[in-house]
Amino acid sequence: MNPIVKHISAVTFAVRDMARSLEFYRKLGFEQLYGGRLASFSSLRAGEAFVNLALVPDYEGQWWGRAIFRVEEVDAYYQALAEQGLAPQLPRDAVWGERFFHIADPDGHELSFAELVK
């Protein structure tokens, strides 16, 4: 049998402060499915994207890569985040056919939001 991977089911991020992280991800448009401000584990969803947050109070953030989320109208999404007081980098075009921007969550996890350029 050859297993066929369909997609990533969820990405789990270590966080130092669950309440702070939940607020950040809510501003990104994620809704809480499980857990909460006092929980050690929370699950969130935005569209078909799932993110888990695992409380690790002594987590020392270190760059490991980034999670990339597909969005429509990346410039409008960027503007909406900036208007909420978040600090996304300016959107830019990539040679591989995407327009994207990066933003770091409160624990330093790099997130990228991208749309395909036609």
Report residues per predicted region:
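Vicinal oxygen chelate
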Residues: 16-18, 67-110
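Conserved short beta-strand elements that form part of the metal-binding/catalytic scaffold
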Residues: 31-65, 110-115
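Residue-level marker for the onset of beta-strands and adjacent loop->beta junctions
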Residues: 9, 39-40, 65, 97-99
